[in-house]
């Protein structure tokens, strides 16, 4: 069995790459392999609409007949056991070997579960797949006491949804503020207040020492020694890139598969994108970004590179969430050195938080301000030089600041 290009991974990175390959004119054989039985679906709906019961299943990224129309072969509910990067072969569980010209590793990430005692007790959940959320919906009932371990994006989204379902919810967060890494302390604190208004208990500076129970979880023991009664618990403390295949194949990995800014690995013809890839950042350094939008952007860049086109696609973290009735968007790393500028007040309406580093706009977070966020995104991507007083002045349109920054950049060139 031969194949020109094999995409390993049925998430947004894999299917976006397949679509981009066809859009850019690739007409050879194209195989998409996914370990789940479902066609690629929107994982961002799992912690919100699907868990809430508003949707029975997560929306498919594309309908079944789309794959036929685009001549993309799907191999579902199968696991890739090995990739021979020298011979360019891919081994499926149960066989066969697939002979390939190029391969894309888009294997994603799995939920991180710290190795504390009791993490395997019934009633302790993680959320990464449709099967995970279906089990939670069957198992969770109004009035149950749920402990959410981790106050990041997924943890806070799950907590909000669980509260709507009538559960009594507590969040345990090991740091001194919710969402601090992705939203910054100011917006993180504002989100904490909104969650508490919903009746969610938030406990900061407290991680988990162990889960206790006999046939099912009954208690969560915090790192500060306190006990929290728990009928159910969910662990939301990040994800681990699925690098096993890459490591077995001899590819360099460090918290993700190391790739260049077009997604290429050290092995010719082997590429990686999405949550599994440690991608170069526009601001320097590298890491796995673990966002839907970045996965799409990486996959698009990789598709071009796989077809021999010159691509340079360093990334900026770019994501969004909906929480307690508010839409929050973010670009860049809001936590870091420099100074902060708040434009507006989220208590009174739309607002943006900017981080300036060496006088340049390096990150932004918006609350209920999608139009201004679009302008803020351009400022961050350009690394625009804007004074803090001007940036925080709501009487000045961000569009005008953008225009001025663009003109300065053209003059500098």
UniProtKB/Swiss-Prot annotation:
Pfam family name, one: Reductase_C
Catalytic reaction list: 2 reduced [2Fe-2S]-[ferredoxin] + NAD(+) + H(+) = 2 oxidized [2Fe-2S]-[ferredoxin] + NADH
Positions bound to NAD(+): 145-173
Cofactor: FAD
Induction of expression: Transcription is up-regulated by aromatic compounds including biphenyl, ethylbenzene, benzene, toluene, xylene, cumene, cymene, and chlorinated benzenes. Is under the control of the BphST two-component regulatory system.
Gene3D superfamilies tied to this protein: 3.30.390.30, FAD/NAD(P)-binding domain
One BP term from GO: catabolic process
Keyword Magnesium: no
GO molecular function: ferredoxin-NAD+ reductase activity; oxidoreductase activity, acting on NAD(P)H
Binding site for FAD: 4-35
UniProt keyword annotation of Flavoprotein present: yes
Gene Ontology cellular component list: cytoplasm
Enzyme Commission code: 1.18.1.3
Entry function: Ferredoxin reductase component of the biphenyl dioxygenase system that catalyzes the stereospecific dihydroxylation of the aromatic ring of biphenyl, yielding a dihydrodiol compound. Is likely involved in biphenyl degradation that allows growth of Rhodococcus sp. strain RHA1 on biphenyl as the sole source of carbon and energy. The dioxygenase system can also use naphtalene and 4-chlorobiphenyl (4-CB) as substrates, as well as some polychlorinated biphenyls (PCB) such as 2,2'-dichlorobiphenyl, 2,3-dichlorobiphenyl and 2,5,2'-trichlorobiphenyl.
Stated name of the protein: Biphenyl 2,3-dioxygenase, ferredoxin reductase component
């Amino acid at each position: 069995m031969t194949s020109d290009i094999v995409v390993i991974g049925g998430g947004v990175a894999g299917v976006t790459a397949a679509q981009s390959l066809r859009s850019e004119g690739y007409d050879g054989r194209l195989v998409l392999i996914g370990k789940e039985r479902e066609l690629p679906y929107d994982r961002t709906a799992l912690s919100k609409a699907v868990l809430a019961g508003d949707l029975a299943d997560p929306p498919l990224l594309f309908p079944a007949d789309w794959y036929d129309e685009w001549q993309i072969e799907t191999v579902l509910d199968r696991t890739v056991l090995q990739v021979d990067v020298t011979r360019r072969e891919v081994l499926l569980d149960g066989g066969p070997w697939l002979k390939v010209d190029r391969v894309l590793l888009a294997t994603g990430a799995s939920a991180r579960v710290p190795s504390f005692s009791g993490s395997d007790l019934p009633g302790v959940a993680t959320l990464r797949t449709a099967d995970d959320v279906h089990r939670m919906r069957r198992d969770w009932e109004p009035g149950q006491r749920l402990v959410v371990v981790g106050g990041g994006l997924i943890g806070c989204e799950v907590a909000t949804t669980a509260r709507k379902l009538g559960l009594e919810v507590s969040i345990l967060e090991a740091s001194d503020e919710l969402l601090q890494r992705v939203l910054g302390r100011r917006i993180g604190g504002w989100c904490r207040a909104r969650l508490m208004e919903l009746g969610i208990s938030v406990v900061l500076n407290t991680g988990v020492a162990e889960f206790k129970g006999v046939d099912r979880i009954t208690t969560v023991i915090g790192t500060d020694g306190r006990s929290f009664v728990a009928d159910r618990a969910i662990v939301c403390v990040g994800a681990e890139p699925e690098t096993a295949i890459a490591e077995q194949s001899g590819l360099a990995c460090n918290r993700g598969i190391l790739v260049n800014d077009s997604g290429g690995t050290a092995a010719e013809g082997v590429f990686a994108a999405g949550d599994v890839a440690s991608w170069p950042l526009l601001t320097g350094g590298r890491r796995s970004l673990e966002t839907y939008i970045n996965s799409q952007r990486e996959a698009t860049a990789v598709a071009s590179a796989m077809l021999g086109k010159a691509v340079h696609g360093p990334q900026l973290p770019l994501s969004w969430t909906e929480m307690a009735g508010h839409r929050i968007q973010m670009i860049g790393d809001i936590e870091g050195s420099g100074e902060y500028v708040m434009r507006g007040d989220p208590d009174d309406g739309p607002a943006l938080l900017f981080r300036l580093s060496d006088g340049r706009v390096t990150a932004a977070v918006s609350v209920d301000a999608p139009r201004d966020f679009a302008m803020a995104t351009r400022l961050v991507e350009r690394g625009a030089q804007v004074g803090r007083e001007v940036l925080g002045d709501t009487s000045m349109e961000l569009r005008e600041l953008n225009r001025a920054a663009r003109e300065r950049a053209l003059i500098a060139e």
